[in-house]
Amino acid sequence: MIVIPDVILLGASAILGLYLGWAYLRRLPRRPVLVGSHLLLGAAGLEIMVVLLRGTPSGQSLALGVVGALAISLTALALLSGLIAGLIARRSRRTADVTLATHAAVAVAGFGLFVAWAIKA
């Protein structure tokens, strides 16, 4: 049950990301505080995932396996693509659509794999 805080952090980031995506599609004004919170929750979740690579605080080793390694890789790629999306999306609406769709797809895959790994851990 050591992975529960990470599931909560990444789940909150995913829910906030869903809201931000919905607001983007509705062309509502962007709220930098929500975008920053989404970024911080995702980064904190990724940090805990990386810390769990070394084992739990009690010294117990978690079997990472291919699923866990892929979940960490996809979550890191989602964080990177989200940062890139924020930088290059200001050029055109089409560029923003493609980068945000890529970010969302990678993030959903990473979160899904992480939850699958967390259930086994």
Name each region found by the language model.
Residues 1-121:
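Membrane-embedded alpha-helical bundles that constitute the cytochrome b-like, heme-associated redox core
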